[in-house]
Design a protein with these regions (language model features):
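C-terminal alpha-helical "lid" subdomain
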Residues: 2-20, 24, 232-233, 238-332
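N-terminal pre-Walker A segment at the start of P-loop NTPase domains
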Residues: 37-58
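Phosphate-binding P-loop
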Residues: 60-68, 104-105
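Hydrophobic positions on the alpha1 helix immediately C-terminal to the Walker A/P-loop
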Residues: 84, 88, 125
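Post-Walker A helix-loop "phosphate-sensing" segment adjacent to the P-loop in P-loop NTPases
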Residues: 91-102, 135-137
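The catalytic "switch" region of P-loop NTPases
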Residues: 172-174, 181-262
Length: 332
């Protein structure tokens, strides 16, 4: 995904989808592969990000003097930030191809996706931008040479419209290397004619938005909060709706619709409302149902779900808290 070839393969591969009603059953291997990939449920965060990115791309289309307005997706781990980012990148790639035609877009790279490496220096970060477009970087090249002669020139020539930078919380402007890397990103936003979108864990509580450099980023970036799904929001039940959407997409021969939404309180307790943990739990339960044939049927039950170990974050949340026994201090 962090190369143009990888992202292009992602953007041009048909999305996973359940079989239409009335079609023959898919084979066991096909259904296992389907639940491994599974569908991407459209969430409020994806909708908000897509709408804002479209607007900002138009807003900054003819802005050439200063950095274009940007967006930052923030939230705790496991709530779907990267998924939202990639779905918006997919939509941008698709819109570009539809607008100009596949033949006319040869050599165009509408979307770039870059991961901030751990303890990123300016050189390693610039090298990640170069690697995405397979730009040759010689061992003796300086960061300035990589940025000026390779990245900025090639990204402009490839007509990159949207640059997505993930794991932005790894930058710490309070350190020398972190400050230099933050300056590099600011420089790129002013020299590459694209809209920049960042994603990271709880970025507003990190040094990224503090100090002089943080103020520069915060002054250009709007925030999109990506939070765990609440069990209830007013008269609505967003988490139950999410479960329903995932259950509808299952391809199990004996599963009864409505089973999982009835378990919404239990599933919310298991996953803390995190879409990543919920998707893993349901996908893993579906694969277990297909391969194990519990009771001779392909269905998900609470027993199936209970037997699945989730990610450590979810398990820590779900771990029952027991009160220590109080000592009997009374005297006979």
């Amino acid at each position: 995904m962090t190369t143009w070839d990888g992202f292009q393969a992602f953007a041009t591969t048909p999305a996973a989808a359940p079989p239409p009603p009335g079609t023959p059953h898919r084979s066991l291997e096909e259904r296992l592969a389907y639940h491994s990939r599974f569908v991407t449920v459209r969430t409020p965060a994806i909708d908000a990000l897509a709408k804002n990115v479209r607007t900002l791309m138009i807003l900054g289309r003819h802005q050439t003097v200063t950095a274009r307005p940007s967006l930052t997706v923030t939230g705790p781990a496991g709530v779907g930030k990267t998924t939202a980012l990639l779905q918006v990148g997919y939509a941008c790639h698709l819109a570009h191809t539809r607008r100009h035609g596949a033949a006319a877009t040869v050599g165009h790279v509408p979307v770039a996706y870059v991961l901030v490496p751990p303890a990123a220096s300016t050189k390693t970060l610039a090298a990640e931008f170069a690697r995405y477009l397979a730009i040759p970087v010689a061992a003796g090249m300086s960061q300035a040479q990589i940025t000026n002669n390779a990245v900025c020139h090639t990204y402009t020539a490839a007509r990159v419209q949207l640059v997505m930078i993930d794991e932005i919380h790894r930058l710490n402007p309070r350190t020398t290397t972190g400050a230099q890397s933050a300056d590099l990103i600011k420089d790129l936003t002013e020299r590459i004619g694209a809209t920049f979108v960042y994603a990271g864990i709880d970025v507003t509580t990190t040094p990224l938005f503090t100090g002089v450099r943080g103020a520069q980023l915060a002054g250009h970036a709007s925030l999109i909060d990506c939070d765990p799904f609440p069990a209830r929001l007013g008269n609505e039940e967003p988490f139950r709706d999410l479960i329903t959407a995932m259950e509808t997409a299952l391809d199990l021969r004996h599963h009864k619709r409505g089973t999982l939404p009835k378990l919404a309180p239990y599933l919310h307790d298991r996953t803390a409302g995190r879409i990543g943990s919920l998707a893993r739990l349901i996908r893993q339960a579906a694969i277990t149902a297909i391969t194990a044939l519990i009771d001779g049927t392909e269905r998900i039950t609470k027993t199936t779900l209970d037997a699945i170990r989730l990610d450590h974050l979810a398990e820590q949340h779900h771990r029952p808290h027991t009160r220590p026994r109080s000592r009997n201090t009374s005297t006979p």
